[in-house]
Amino acid sequence: MQAITLLGSTGSIGTQTLDLVAQYPERFRVVGLTSYSNVTLLAEQVWRFRPQIVAIGREELLPELRSLLTGMRPLPELVAGTEGLCQVAAHPAAQRVVTGIVGCAGLLPTLAAIRAGKDIALANKETLVAGGPVVLPLVREYGVKLIPVDSEHSAIFQCLQGVPPGSLRRILLTASGGAFRDWPAEKLDQVTLADALKHPNWVMGRKITIDSATLMNKGLEVIEAHWLFGLDYDRIEVLIHPQSIVHSLIELADTSVLAQLGWPDMHLPILYGLSWPERLATPWDPLDLVKLGSLTFKAPDHRKYPCLQLAYAAGQAGGTLPAVLNAANEAAVALFLQERIRFLDIPRLLEQVCERHQVIPAPSLEDILEVDAWARQQVELLAQQAPAQVLA
């Protein structure tokens, strides 16, 4: 039986992971759970899955969590704050850690898990986008395995099983195109928050749904793929694939192309991240290609998706620039979700913050954390200035 710790148990990845734990009780048991602030749902999960250790990110919510668990015997160890998240990530009873925390907040707990020798089912792309220069050397030092959970990287990981080293020519990441794939670029200045949250294929969290609409999600995945699979950026391409059935493809040295297909449902890549190197039988409906009829692909329109080019540029520049781009994007998307800025202000803000940054070529963890905070502050400062001067 696999003992797992789940970081970000109340989010989209976390709740779907627990669905799978409940479906396969003979295969998985929960050792630790964490949430940033959803104390009510976290308490419900603790009552159901009986972990040994639980963390709440916001320390002031710890008394409420303790109150919601009154009468539980045995009571799990309750911890809080970033230190508490890291304690859960490194707990000695866990064999595999699922990182479902959204954003750069997942970096420190993931590092704690790696240093504790845990294999990582990685659903937090920002860990590698921002922290790749620090994370990958630690992965090699501690001999742990990174098993990608993002559907695209899981697809590539699956396609690479059994492929001889040195045979990979390029990666083709697929993207749905998000909420505005059928909108002309000229109409994007009319986008509302409600429009941007209508993803055509996937059910996801709010932040990643906006990232899908801007294609920044795919840009971050390009950077993540660079770190996971060791390819230069000119060997990582993006295709718009409206049906979201082909989750990604690889091209090999002999021009053979391998692809992984499946319904647009995160349960499958999460399950593979939990069970690898095994595959578990599922009760789900099989893919029906006859019913689907056709699968289509096209190149992304860079006028419509400037964030994709910003991500490629940041990845190629390297150093601290990907961390700056990621932090600025998190801050800008948060402002858009609060309806404090417009949709097209997101790429404008990102470009301005990146232009202001002096890149540190070989950053330490401290450098990454410092530029992360700096980029968020810059977004807030720019957004507070007159839109006509700053965002036009």
Curated annotation (Swiss-Prot):
Its cofactor is Mg(2+); Mn(2+). It holds the Pfam family DXP_reductoisom. The keyword Oxidoreductase applies. NADPH binds at residues 10-13, 38, 124, 126, 205. It catalyses: 2-C-methyl-D-erythritol 4-phosphate + NADP(+) = 1-deoxy-D-xylulose 5-phosphate + NADPH + H(+). Pathway: Isoprenoid biosynthesis; isopentenyl diphosphate biosynthesis via DXP pathway; isopentenyl diphosphate from 1-deoxy-D-xylulose 5-phosphate: step 1/6. Mn(2+) binds at residues 150, 152, 221. Keywords: Isoprene biosynthesis, Manganese, Metal-binding, NADP, Oxidoreductase. Catalyzes the NADPH-dependent rearrangement and reduction of 1-deoxy-D-xylulose-5-phosphate (DXP) to 2-C-methyl-D-erythritol 4-phosphate (MEP). This is 1-deoxy-D-xylulose 5-phosphate reductoisomerase. It comes from Synechococcus sp. (strain JA-3-3Ab) (Cyanobacteria bacterium Yellowstone A-Prime). The gene is dxr.
